[in-house]
Amino acid sequence: MQQRQLGSQGLTVSALGLGCMGMSFGYGQNDERQSLNTLARAFELGINFLDTAEVYGPYTNEALVAKAIKGRSDIKVATKFGFRISEQGEGRARMTGANSDPAHIRRAVEGSLQRLGVETIELLYQHRPDPAVPVEDVVGTMADLVREGKVKYLGLSEVSSATLRRAQAVHPISALQSEYSLWSRDPEWDILATCRELNIGFVPYSPLGRGFLTGKFPAADTLAADDFRRTLPRFQLDAQAHNQRLVDR
């Protein structure tokens, strides 16, 4: 497996990473044993870069990843904070808005460390921008966690080039994560160029279009009732039929 360096601070990961969200959140129910077998096979193939978040579950995805990496020191896990999580409801219904308040960041990191069973988080992302908290305050808190040894490298997700520049001025950012695939190409407008300029790694999520570009995607109305893709315009029946014709070319 080829390796890639993300940013300028020393983070090196496998060229292919594995996003774990769908194993316990967002895409309907999944079998834990099957998910663990998938992770074990990924490790055999040389993948050492996993992506999770506290909000996936919530919390259960990090616990799943912890089972997969237990006893290993070669796997690099990225996790995220940035949402207010209600004690009420199930799944995505528990996400009640952005929260990157410094105190919340610290609570989230302590929780992630405990659930993942690690002493240090390899890569910590802000999951989404919080309009109520300046990015300088967010990254300042994250940088404090680096100095305290609780986090190694910092990342952001779905921010603009201007925000990325402001963040980089506070502390080196190792990775920027955004959706990027053949049918979601917004990063080509400017964010990829900004990442190159600032020497920040770019980590695409959903590179297979949330499964659609595999060529094996079922009709959206056959997805599980709690599969959030049912709510996305691109998967509505008319749009999906049009998009499928493009994939089939």
Regions from the language model: what does each represent?
Residues 1-76:
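N-terminal binding-site loop/beta-alpha segment at the start of enzyme catalytic domains
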Residues 6, 18, 35, 42, ...:
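Conserved, mostly hydrophobic/aromatic
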Residues 21-33, 91-106, 127-132:
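Active-site mouth loops of central-metabolism enzymes
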Residues 29-42, 98-117, 160-166:
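Short, acidic/polar
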Residues 41, 45, 115-116, 149, ...:
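Structural motif
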Residues 75-86:
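A short, structured active-site edge motif that brings together acidic residues
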Residues 87-123, 179, 183:
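Active-site gating/metal-coordination segments in enzymes
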Residues 129-249:
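Beta/alpha (TIM)-barrel catalytic core signal, keyed to glycine-rich beta->alpha loops juxtaposed to Asp/Glu
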